[in-house]
Amino acid sequence: MIQRDVLLRQIQQLTHALVRIAEMITNREFDRALEAIDEQLNMQLDGSAEGLRRIPPERLLALCHENGRFSAQAAQTLARLLRLQGDAHAGRDEDAAAGACYGRALLLLRAALQSDDATVSWKIGTHLAELQRLTDEHPPGDDVAGALQ
């Protein structure tokens, strides 16, 4: 139970940070947004923005498992983070990096929607459609494209 509480607290802290990061992207502060994403991933998940952008799809999905169960909440939070990271890369005209982020975000949202205990945002359909459009515009690498099939 303690492990789940820690995970939920990390997700909550990450969610608060996402609001600030989204504001940076709205203000076209792409470098600052990527630095903030990297900082949050380091603090909350002991990782990096580049690591999350390059993580193999199966390992990305495994990050959202706890005690053998898939956490739709964790998947949606990571998907939001990856979407923002993709937006920052797209703002810097880094199409390959943007595609890698968008593709992974789409993969996570699809998994969240298919989860047995899926408590998902009522806007998930809109988010899925938008991520599909962005993934079409900024194709992900072959590993993610294969996982999305």
What is the predicted role of each segment?
Residues 1-75, 110-111, 133-149:
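N-terminal alpha-helical interaction modules that lie
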Residues 7-15, 72-80, 99, 103, ...:
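Start-of-helix signal in alpha-solenoid helical-repeat scaffolds, especially tetratricopeptide repeats
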Residues 22, 86-87, 93, 112-114, ...:
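Short coil/turn linking the two alpha-helices of tandem helical-hairpin repeats
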Residues 24, 82-85, 89, 109, ...:
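Residue at a conserved register position within TPR or TPR-like alpha-solenoid repeats
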